[in-house]
Amino acid sequence: MPTTASIAAVKNNGSSITCEFFWAGDSRGYFLDADGLCQVTKDDIKTDEDAFTNLRSDGRMSNVIHAEGDFSLNTREIEISQPAMIITSTDGGFGYYGTPMDFEYIILSSLMESDSPEEWENKLSELIIPVTGDDFAVGIAVYGLDDIADCREHFKERCQFIKESYIDPVGENADEEQLLRLWQKYKPGYYRR
């Protein structure tokens, strides 16, 4: 049975981290800092669609892990200033939301409502399970912050910004044109690395 993967190997350098992502298929690796969510990996799909367009077309994969035949693991190493989150996710975690902004918002809003890492994990799962049409795995590691309270405080402003700039303006009755305009505004930061 074919599968996809996203793996992050992280080295803590003090004020920064070196992160090497390994992936195959459409599982993704990200980092999230005060400037927002940034997709580091590139989906193995047959077209050159961006993250917004691929949510609508679910591009056909060109590389998956399987026991028979050829596949490859892609790799990319980047240095990231702390504090930051390193995130890996299968498409079941992000692929059933309307926009990449929604995925960032569920990560941050679930954090804002949590008093422990376990509670954050549960709240994030509670937001993903009702919308996903797939199994999912989301891994989050936080660097440069002491505890969940520090993490909430550090990302509070970003969560509010995403809510006011991208979530509240569309509500539940968003049309494609409006979503595309918001995506065009969000996209440069999302692909900044």
How would you describe each model-predicted region?
Residues 35-48, 100-111:
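Short, surface-exposed, charged loop/turn segments at secondary-structure junctions
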Residues 25, 44-48, 158-164:
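Short, solvent-exposed aromatic-acidic interface loops
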Residues 15-23, 36-43, 147-157:
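Short, well-ordered strand-loop elements centered on a beta-strand within folded domains, enriched
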Residues 38-86:
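Conserved, helical-rich catalytic subdomain that frames metal- and/or nucleotide-binding sites
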Residues 3-6, 41, 90:
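Ser/Thr-centric signal marking residues that sit
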Residues 70-193:
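C-terminal catalytic subdomain
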Residues 1-33, 61-81:
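Catalytic core of PPM/PP2C metal-dependent serine/threonine phosphatase domains
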Residues 28-29, 46-47, 94-95:
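Short, catalytically relevant binding-site loops at active-site mouths
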